[in-house]
């Protein structure tokens, strides 16, 4: 392990859904609840079909697959209302999440939320979970204008935080995002999530280290600095 690898980072970037916020169950339930709300019976394959999709894509899929009377825009409006209610009123952090971000902040580490979830949901989620005052930056893919497959997303985050890639860590549950960040020179920590078990082998292989839970933060290479 190199000294830089075990050094206290100047910045830590957190993915939101499945990494910092315990939202997997909500994303499992939301499409099912939406289909029932629209007056249809959910198919067993609904979650598998919608898991990798964004909100507009979910709305379009449900409209097309269930031939809904409601337009795509009306389906999206119903989905948006459900998601906003969750993030603004029901969201919780994953075990160990609050302790980790508070320790990082207490040592002077800059914190960023880097997420593919819309900013309309991300900021209320931080407020709902009581950690909004700890984050120096919220960068969403809709705000950045690119996905986390695009290196420009992480370049933007680093520029706004005023840190170099080797000075930053990314905590993430998606292998594709970890690969993008590592290619830029960021250190990466994979985080287990029940909703992304299919991706876990790739996450373990791609990341510098892996945590079964954020509560295991003492296993981090720089834990002795916290």
Name each model-derived stretch.
Residues 93, 114, 146:
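Residue-level marker of regulatory loop/turn positions in helix-turn-helix DNA-binding domains and
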Residues 5-107:
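N-terminal helical cap/lid subdomain that shapes the substrate entry/recognition surface
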Residues 82-86, 110, 161, 224-226:
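Electropositive, surface-exposed helix/loop patches at the edges of structured domains
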Residues 112-113, 190:
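Hydrophobic beta-strand core positions in alpha/beta domains
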Residues 41, 110, 187:
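Residue-level detector of anion-binding/catalytic polar loops
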Residues 37, 46-49, 65, 87, ...:
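Short, flexible active-site loop motifs that bind/organize anionic cofactors or intermediates
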Residues 19, 115-117:
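Conserved phosphate-coupling serine/threonine residues in phosphotransfer and NTP-handling enzymes
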Residues 1-10, 102-105, 118-226:
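Asp-based, Mg2+/Mn2+-dependent phosphohydrolase catalytic module
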């Amino acid at each position: 392990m190199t000294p830089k690898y075990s050094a206290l980072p100047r910045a830590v970037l957190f993915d939101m859904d499945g990494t910092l916020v315990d939202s997997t169950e909500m994303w499992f339930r939301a499409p099912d609840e939406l289909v029932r709300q629209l007056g249809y019976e959910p198919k067993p394959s609904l979650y598998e079909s919608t898991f990798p999709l964004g909100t507009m894509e979910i709305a379009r899929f449900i409209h097309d697959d269930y031939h809904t009377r409601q337009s795509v825009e009306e389906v999206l409006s119903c989905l948006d209302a459900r998601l906003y209610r969750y993030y603004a009123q029901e969201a919780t952090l994953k075990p160990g999440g609050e302790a980790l971000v508070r320790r990082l902040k207490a040592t002077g580490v800059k914190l960023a939320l880097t997420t593919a979830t819309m900013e309309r949901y991300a900021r209320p989620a931080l407020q709902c979970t009581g950690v909004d005052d700890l984050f120096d930056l919220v960068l969403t893919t809709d705000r950045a204008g690119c996905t986390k497959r695009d290196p420009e997303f992480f370049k933007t985050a680093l520029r706004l935080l005023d840190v170099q890639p080797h000075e930053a860590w990314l905590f993430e549950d998606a292998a594709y995002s970890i690969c993008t960040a590592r290619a830029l020179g960021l250190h990466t920590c994979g985080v287990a999530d029940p909703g992304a078990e299919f991706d876990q082998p790739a996450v373990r292989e791609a990341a510098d280290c892996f945590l079964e839970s954020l509560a295991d933060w003492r296993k981090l290479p720089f834990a002795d600095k916290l």
